[in-house]
Amino acid sequence: MSSAASFRTEKDLLGVLEVPAQAYYGIQTLRAINNFRLSGVPISHYPKLVVGLAMVKQAAADANRELGQLSEAKHAAISEACARLIRGDFHEEFVVDMIQGGAGTSTNMNANEVIANIALEAMGHQKGEYQYLHPNNDVNMAQSTNDAYPTAIRLGLLLGHDALLASLDSLIQAFAAKGEEFSHVLKMGRTQLQDAVPMTLGQEFRAFATTLSEDLARLKTLAPELLTEVNLGGTAIGTGINADPRYQALAVQRLATISGQPLVPAADLIEATSDMGAFVLFSGMLKRTAVKLSKICNDLRLLSSGPRTGINEINLPARQPGSSIMPGKVNPVIPEAVNQVAFQIIGNDLALTMAAEGGQLQLNVMEPLIAFKIFDSIRLLQRAMDMLREHCIVGITANEARCRELVEHSIGLVTALNPYIGYENATRIARVALESGRGVLELVREEGLLDDAMLDDILRPENMIAPRLVPLKA
């Protein structure tokens, strides 16, 4: 192919540019590529967003066809293009950086141009022959970036929501399974990193499952509550300028059918076009889950510390050598990675919050950053949960003897004995144990405060880890 044949000429209100001949995007996308070399993350990095854009364009085309605004031939060609995008074709043509000025116009035009050029080829024309089917006049008919783009973001989040929930649920089940496996392993609970009272390792892991189950329940209800109201049909600022009065209801109805999502028109299109509150709340829920995961990973790192000089109550699966200078060292790399993912999600939430606050009057032009951060948080969170489950949780084993040893040598054990030997004896035993380094049980036996049968009964896991009626003394 000659140099001249490697490009096609396109023009817009700013002039003429040479667009790569093989590209399905057009001149406005090319300008955005040249303008926004920022994150290095293109729209195609988030396939559900691309699919959401294609579904919005399909719904708009269907509504415009039904209203007689779009010819049958153009509708058929646009429909073919959108179907291919929904199947996963041509995603590499979505090349605009996720961070961009213009309130998402570059993303919207990237979609309009790609769909137009796929449609043109389906009609037997060449890319760029927009006199036959135009990115703005036909693909973007009755739309503005300000309603098509936020609708696509919401839809993309909904389309990916089930996968996020599935990953979270699988992680919960993994923790619950370990809770059952370790239900007989007695260990010391700790508060403020100090010995507290006995519990089982199973209780500890079941608590991990329970706290994440709370978030699973909230996420299941939050997304449908927050993301199903769309402003499609509001066009530029929510007034619906340049759209048929019947268009909004038709377009949203078609989008709900195409996507399988229970989408409804926003009650107030002006408000829905300018307010980003739904994204703030949803991102906050992702942050909450990330915070919980990070805390759990802190616990896993502490409980596995050592192996000779730490707590060493559990063993994490060895994933890779841990040091270039210390032979034999193995680090808790999976929990450490999850910690870092959590920090990133927390940072994403703050950036998103600032972007939501940065809106002015009838539009929030910072929506590209909002989209970037929320899709990034979902991807990171889902991958982190899968990694944690597959490469860490399912392979955790308990050091039962170590757990028992720490219980028997812990000063905290005296709390369980207090109802039987009395507060003064318990206080004295604790002091002597601390001063001498001897174990609580050893001292109790030495002083004859309780016999072995009574101690064995008190120290049974089922008697140590739950409320128990203590016989009253005469």
From Swiss-Prot:
> What GO annotations for molecular function exist for this entry?
aspartate ammonia-lyase activity
Q: Write the protein's name.
A: Aspartate ammonia-lyase
Q: Recite the UniProt keywords alphabetically.
A: Lyase
Q: Which family does it belong to?
A: Belongs to the class-II fumarase/aspartase family. Aspartase subfamily.
Q: What does this protein do?
A: Lyase involved in the degradation of canavanine, the delta-oxa-analog of arginine, allowing growth on canavanine as sole nitrogen and carbon source. Probably catalyzes the conversion of L-aspartate to fumarate and ammonia.
Source organism of the structure: Pseudomonas canavaninivorans
Instruction: Note down the stretches annotated as region SS loop.
Output: 322-331
Relate the assembly described in the record: Homotetramer.
Explain what induces or represses this protein's expression: Up-regulated upon growth on canavanine.
